Amino acid sequence: RPDSGKVYVDGKDIFSLKEEALTIFRRRKIGFVFQAYNLVPVLSVYENVVLPVELDGKKADREFVQEILDTLGIREKERNLPGQLSGGQQQRAAIARALAAKPAILLCDEPTGNLDSCTSQDVLGLLKVSGQKFAQTIVMITHNEEIAQMADRIIRIEDGRILSAGERGLV
């Protein structure tokens, strides 16, 4: 919880929510992209992508999922298992999974940390396109200055304290 202030997402003060409501909020409104992908190895790409939606007791929007897979360039891999994919394809599947529930916010923890520089640029471009296309806020954690400079806004944090915040080029 924040030391001061409030956090609003979709008009709701999320820290005024009770624990159960906050859990539901996280599941429905926040997509997570992990550095290590965290794909389930025995599930196909498609099954991994729709898993969070189905765990929420909902039916996946197949047309929307296909659109995401097309946008990320992995639709032809939807029946493959994660072990049959390159690192970049696995990261794209992880991004697709984060997008499938149509979250308001994507939290990306070093999404290019395990990728080569060419694949990293592809993934960053896809995140930007996805954020614009699906109207999402993307919060990305990175230690890479080049990647940070691609953001619209940069917040530098050290030891849990904000050192600086502002528009790209001004921080």
Can you name each region flagged by the protein language model?
Residues R1-I157:
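ABC family nucleotide-binding domain
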